[in-house]
């Protein structure tokens, strides 16, 4: 939006969720940007057990699809297609409406590739996820965050690979800067370190990272602390510390930020 301010952008949001105006206040108040905030009406509590015709879910999809059909957009971008399990998030649409091309960002298909770990343990989520996979295959195009996710989508989804584009979500060095003097992180105390930024869910493989780090020669561990940034809940921190005990990793070499 900052690179192409001459275009018109509509932030199409869900009235059943939190108001996002404060999160985008800078962009909305910037008169150089042509950004419109729109809350699409939905029928509350869309996740009732019945989702067929005339259900709250069905009616909300009709409202959403109608709104999308009249905003005269050139393209609709969905930033996360797998949201909406047991909450009021709504990303589905009805193709009987005259809609512009619809594309979605795709991050991974890990639950599909590891169904025993993610899907088979929860039949309700499995049904939700597989329906999303089917819907995803009916979109006009996909934007993958990496070449790996592009290949994964081409392999497992029923969509022409030529409509899957790798947009790469690598970090932009212009967004980062050196630690400021008033930072509460004591870099001298850390010394040299290995940094892990992520959650504790199985797909992140933090358990194996702890195991691998603990298996390093002691002189390397002493010289390179392992720094973990979550944030983590109290329960997750306890779990990580249990892994450290399992692999005989002294707590002084692991730093939680």
Predicted regions and their residues:
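Carbohydrate transferase catalytic cores enriched for Leloir-type hexosyltransferases
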Residues: 1-257
């Amino acid at each position: 939006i900052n690179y192409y301010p001459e275009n018109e952008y509509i932030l199409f949001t869900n009235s059943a969720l939190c108001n996002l105006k404060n999160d985008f206040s800078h962009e909305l108040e910037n008169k150089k940007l042509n950004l419109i905030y729109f809350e699409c009406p939905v029928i509350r509590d869309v996740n009732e057990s019945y989702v067929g015709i005339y259900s709250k879910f069905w009616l909300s999809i009709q409202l959403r699809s109608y709104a999308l059909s009249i905003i005269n957009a050139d393209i609709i971008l969905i930033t996360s297609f797998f949201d909406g399990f047991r909450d009021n998030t709504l990303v589905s649409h009805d193709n009987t409406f005259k809609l512009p091309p619809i594309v979605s960002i795709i991050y991974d298909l890990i639950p599909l590739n590891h169904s025993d770990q993610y899907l088979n343990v929860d039949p309700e989520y499995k049904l939700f996820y597989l329906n999303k996979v089917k819907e995803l295959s009916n979109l006009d195009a996909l934007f993958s965050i990496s070449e790996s996710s592009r290949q994964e989508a081409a392999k497992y989804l029923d969509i022409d690979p030529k409509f899957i584009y790798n947009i790469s979500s690598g970090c932009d060095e212009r967004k980062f800067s050196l630690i400021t003097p008033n930072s509460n992180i004591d870099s001298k105390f850390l010394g040299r370190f290995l940094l892990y930024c992520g959650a504790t869910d199985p797909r992140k493989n933090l358990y194996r990272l702890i195991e691998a780090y603990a298996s390093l020669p002691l002189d390397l561990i002493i010289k390179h602390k392992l720094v973990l940034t979550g944030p983590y809940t109290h329960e997750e921190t306890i779990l990580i510390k249990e892994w450290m005990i399992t692999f005989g990793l002294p707590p002084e070499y692991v730093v939680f930020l």
